[in-house]
C-alpha cells in the first residue's frame, strides 16, 4: 500500500467514525479544501508532516493516534 493510500484510508476512517465531511475537517484544520480533496483522492503522494499535523489538529487527535494503525506499520508500505 502506498503512503497516499494509507493516509486517504485513515482520513476516511475518522470522517466516517465522526460523521463529518472533508469541508468540516478543512475548516477545523485550517487546510484548504483542495488540499484535503487531493489527499483524500491519493493525488498527493507524500504529504508533509505539517499537513498531517494540521489534519490531526482538526480531528483533535495526536499524530501518534493517526499513525497507529496497520496501514502505517506494514513492512509493505510503498514509498513513492
Predicted regions and their residues:
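Short, basic-rich loop-to-helix N-cap that marks the start of a DNA-contacting helix
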Residues: 43-54
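Short, charge-rich amphipathic interface segments used for partner binding and complex assembly
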Residues: 53-57, 65
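DNA major-groove recognition helix of helix-turn-helix
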Residues: 15, 40, 51, 67-70
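The alpha-helix within a helix-turn-helix
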Residues: 15, 26, 56
Amino acid at each position: 500500500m502506498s503512503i497516499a493510500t494509507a493516509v486517504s484510508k485513515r482520513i476516511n476512517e475518522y470522517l466516517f467514525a465522526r460523521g463529518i465531511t472533508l469541508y468540516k475537517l478543512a475548516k477545523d484544520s485550517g487546510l484548504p479544501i483542495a488540499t484535503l480533496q487531493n489527499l483524500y483522492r491519493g493525488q498527493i503522494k507524500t504529504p508533509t508532516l505539517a499537513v498531517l499535523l494540521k489534519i490531526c489538529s482538526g480531528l483533535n487527535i495526536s499524530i501518534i493516534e493517526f499513525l497507529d494503525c496497520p496501514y502505517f506499520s506494514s513492512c509493505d508500505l510503498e514509498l513513492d
